[in-house]
């Protein structure tokens, strides 16, 4: 009798045993839930698959994710396109490549012709730059030939894009991934009666600019003059006169004056990626207070961040690279300016938008188990899930007036992270506490044991739980019964797998994607009971 009771009692079910028939085994051997198709695709679009995980190599992780996307496109291409466009329009993802791959799969392989056409119609919106278009073409070409729909879809981009935008592509994005603008034009054969547009397209193909009087062609005219520049000063003057991007200037004259001019002629994305180069050539230094102040004002301007489509991960990556004083590949060194490092931290927070507090009692639980120290989040070199969890938790910790941050693996212990911590100190604290296997029930069990009043549990994890004797969903029910309150559980997934400890059928549990720019406000609304 006792054995039978034990067998059916969920309180006696460890995480290595299935709690119900909806659970599946994760990569660590524990049983969890699978997220919905929409949630899994969103994870792929936001987090990508670069770097693998502790339990799955980069290659296996990539194959699993891309196989899922392929299968979803065959089964419900309309859903795949809707989710992709939602992420793109909301500026929720740090990289465009996952969205470009999904769009290429729909455009080339969707069973329904209407879905394929819809994907091609969306191409100008998703491939916003010349680089993105060439990346898309590399994906699309690998999936099939150049039929009528493909030729028409690519031609449409060149026929409808603003001429000044095309002219910028002609000098800034000449070739990527084995594809050039000339290659695309020779295959697509766009047609137009617009003389300025035809002039740009001809220049893309053969490098010759016809004599057409149009302001849109000035960037190409300036580029042609810059190719003849013999000095840094001459090239810098042309950049300012013609508003040239850095790529329009030959590499042998890219000295300090050219980089100083580039600060005025290039956007915020360029600035984030080139802070180290600005320091390397002597433009951004502690002694140049005017330049430092100008950089800080741009980095901390909320409107400029939104206008420049700066994702929080862009700012975090820039901070990680710039603060270490040398490039990711070891090329070039510089002296980081502390005020610029602080501005990048502020930019990280501002890039999430105006996050409102839920004003509920939050327990922020960071998974610091061994698996969280492996792999790179969203392809950012050196940004482990462990560090990403600490960075994400700081947003909630600085927003919510009543929040506590703890770390868990097989046990639960304080991390000492406070709202006053910098990104670096918070990530260091999380890294220094890394230990043991993963038991995602620990935060809830600890709160019940300590009789701590919690309205919202937020668990930052890779969902590879396996080491506990109680499933997290059961622990939440036990807590509610013991404390006489109905808490909510938010799971912030930091790897692009299909797993979650949150039961998708329960209204008191929510699974969100780590580093989704929309995540903090969605979490607030859920904690308030608004969704």
UniProtKB/Swiss-Prot annotation:
<keyword id="KW-0687">Ribonucleoprotein</keyword>
<dbReference type="Pfam" id="PF05731">
    <property type="entry name" value="TROVE"/>
</dbReference>
<feature type="binding site">
    <location>
        <position position="438"/>
    </location>
    <ligand>
        <name>a divalent metal cation</name>
    </ligand>
</feature>
<feature type="binding site">
    <location>
        <position position="371"/>
    </location>
    <ligand>
        <name>a divalent metal cation</name>
    </ligand>
</feature>
<keyword id="KW-0963">Cytoplasm</keyword>
<keyword id="KW-0479">Metal-binding</keyword>
<keyword id="KW-0694">RNA-binding</keyword>
<dbReference type="InterPro" id="IPR037214">
    <property type="entry name" value="TROVE_dom_sf"/>
</dbReference>
<dbReference type="Pfam" id="PF25045">
    <property type="entry name" value="vWA_Ro60"/>
</dbReference>
<dbReference type="GO" id="GO:0003723">
    <property type="term" value="F:RNA binding"/>
</dbReference>
<feature type="region of interest" description="VWFA-like domain">
    <location>
        <begin position="352"/>
        <end position="531"/>
    </location>
</feature>
<dbReference type="InterPro" id="IPR053680">
    <property type="entry name" value="Ro_60_kDa"/>
</dbReference>
<dbReference type="InterPro" id="IPR056800">
    <property type="entry name" value="vWA_Ro60"/>
</dbReference>
<feature type="region of interest" description="RNA-binding">
    <location>
        <begin position="128"/>
        <end position="274"/>
    </location>
</feature>
<dbReference type="GO" id="GO:0046872">
    <property type="term" value="F:metal ion binding"/>
</dbReference>
<comment type="function">
    <text>Binds to several small RNAs that accumulate during recovery from UV irradiation. Contributes to the resistance of D.radiodurans to ultraviolet irradiation.</text>
</comment>
<feature type="binding site">
    <location>
        <position position="369"/>
    </location>
    <ligand>
        <name>a divalent metal cation</name>
    </ligand>
</feature>
<dbReference type="GO" id="GO:0005737">
    <property type="term" value="C:cytoplasm"/>
</dbReference>
<protein>
    <recommendedName>
        <fullName>RNA-binding protein RO60</fullName>
    </recommendedName>
</protein>
<feature type="domain" description="TROVE">
    <location>
        <begin position="24"/>
        <end position="360"/>
    </location>
</feature>
<dbReference type="InterPro" id="IPR008858">
    <property type="entry name" value="TROVE_dom"/>
</dbReference>
<dbReference type="GO" id="GO:1990904">
    <property type="term" value="C:ribonucleoprotein complex"/>
</dbReference>
<dbReference type="InterPro" id="IPR036465">
    <property type="entry name" value="vWFA_dom_sf"/>
</dbReference>
<comment type="subunit">
    <text>Forms oligomers upon binding DrY RNA, The multimers are of an average size of 700 kDa and are composed of around 12 molecules of Rsr-DrY RNA.</text>
</comment>
<dbReference type="InterPro" id="IPR040322">
    <property type="entry name" value="TROVE2"/>
</dbReference>
<comment type="similarity">
    <text>Belongs to the Ro 60 kDa family.</text>
</comment>
